[in-house]
Amino acid sequence: MALPKQRIRTGRRSNPPEPTQGIQSLVLRVLVYGAAICTFAVLLFLIGYILIRGIPYLTPDLFSLEYTSENCSMLPSIITTVEMTLLSLVIAIPVSVFTAVYLVEYAKKGNKLVGLMRLTTETLSGIPSIVYGLFGMLFFVTQLHWKLSLLSGSLTLSIMVLPLIMRSTEEALLAVPDLYREASFGLGAGRLRTVFRIVLPSAMPGILAGIILAVGRIVGETAALIYTAGTATELPSGLLSSGRTLAVHMYCLSSEGLHTDQAYATAVVLLLIVLAMNTISALIARKLTKN
């Protein structure tokens, strides 16, 4: 008679988890969830406080086309904010995107010029905004005789957001798999066609993320614009006319101490504009990702 086969266990028996590991996991989970809840609670508190203080003072007078000391209209500031944001992005986006394309797609690894450009970008991103404002005042306003104007402020803002968009674009391009490039080259496409037809569309969500951050910095900037664009309350008649953005308008109202309620109302509008821009950009990025 054949003896029944016995299973031979060659693997080692896993040791039961120690009690300290369970405690450490629980503590780590509590810390992670606690940090997330605190962050979300602070955000809700800030948004709720601004809305509660500002919504009751959103009157039709605040949206008059002409600013007076009585209505403290923010409509000229809204229009100036849109104009300055668009002009700054028109200047900054092509320069930053093409620079990032050169660094990732064309420059050789270990090139000293690439290292110098990245060092310059990191240095520019760490400079305080007041220094940018001082540079814009001395160069654009005084040296070029453009005075306090939309053009001076927009050029200063474009220099400020240039490192942000460039680094985001560079990271987005590096995230595109090399398989896409190799497949395009295998089909006979050149490098230029591959970059503009394959690489850039694949990296578009990351590029848009950098542009969103740049828009947020432009809309919320005050220090640099006070020195370059001025604080004029009327609508600018041209690129060489002075004007104030929403953030500068809110700063002026709050610093005077006479129109604090209108300053909170301006903060509500500024918050809604930023949320709307972020939502629209996120929807565009999601659509591009699906395509």
What is each model feature region?
Residues E70-C72, L225-L271:
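Interhelical loop and adjacent transmembrane-helix boundary motif
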Residues L103, L174, I212, S255-N291:
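C-terminal transmembrane helix and the adjacent membrane-cytosol boundary/short C-terminal tail
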Residues L89, S168-T169, R191-T228:
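Transmembrane alpha-helices
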Residues P128, L187-G188, P201:
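Glycine/proline-centered hinge or cleavage motifs at structural transition points of membrane proteins
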Residues I79, E83-I91, V95, T99, ...:
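Hydrophobic alpha-helical transmembrane segments of multipass integral membrane proteins
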